[in-house]
Amino acid sequence: MESLFLLVLGNTEISTVPGISVAGATPELTKLTPVADAEYLFHEKPLTIDVIPVTPEGHPTPAIITKAARELANFPVLVVRGGTYLAPLVPHVHISDAVGRDFRKEPALPEFGDIIKRAKLFGEELNKTPIKELVIGESTPGGTTTAQAVLWALGYEARTSSASPDNPQSLKEKVIAEAFERAGIEKGQLRDNPLEALRQFGDPMMATVIGIALGFRRDIVLAGGTQMLAVSALLKALGEDLSRFMIATTKWVANDKSATFIETAKEIGIISYAADLDFSKSEFKGLRDYERGYVKEGVGAGGATWLAVKAGFSPEDVSEKVEELYRRLMEMK
């Protein structure tokens, strides 16, 4: 087996700050998005809730892209519970049920050490298999805000993306400023103490991916946008050689003018791939709006597309399959 796709699920209380995350129809529903995303990959629709996760405007979860790529290329998917409110109702590896706290009030992840340790054990077991490459995606509502906080703590002048075309950058910065004040630190102050940056401002997805990457010593594709930049920056600060890593995301993240994906990836020193999906001709507004900056990435959409392309399919094939899956969803309503 050449490649294994891991989907790491995480929750953080930050997703319930009004206006921060649109990875769910309401702030409260963002708590269920990770498990619903995982369930949708294996079933016609999620089991925990009866609908697929959508933004408040009704745009479908990027899990639809991952599912489309998987239906084409048939790569194996393993779900990893990094730290969520609920367990997904699909087979999964349990790392923790610790949820990231609201970092304005307290350190985000006191359990980071246990999570890294367990995830590293899991990575070490995967290292004993013939798998040559892990492609690691994530579903973590609120995760672009924790990512930006971690990147700032490590000294990167980064702006992270958002699943909304109106990136709530000023709200993110206000929330992060409050967190830095609580922790008594300034930008860049934790560049030599990455684990403290993770403890203070991170989320369980980051800790899980770091642990897996420390245990599995072959090639790793970090399948995500700006959230995986935070993971890369933490790995680099921990002394990892980034030459065995790459980030796979979508063109919607790479082209996001409100964020600094390309610049920050360069600054960290990690190569990236941006899946050239195109929904502009879709018959569904929910998909066409991806081209207007809605949703952009998540659930390893870019990495799943990359696996499909490696298996001989084109980004157009993936886009067509997404259209078909979305039609199936509409017919089920």
UniProtKB/Swiss-Prot annotation:
GO molecular function terms noted in the UniProt entry: nicotinate-nucleotide-dimethylbenzimidazole phosphoribosyltransferase activity
HAMAP family: UPF0284 (MF_01086)
Species classification: Archaea, Methanobacteriati, Methanobacteriota, Thermococci, Thermococcales
Family listed: Belongs to the UPF0284 family.
Organism: Thermococcus gammatolerans (strain DSM 15229 / JCM 11827 / EJ3)
CDD domains in UniProt: DMB-PRT_CobT
Name the record gives this protein: UPF0284 protein TGAM_0534
Pfam family, any one: DBI_PRT
Signal sequence, renumbered to the chain: none
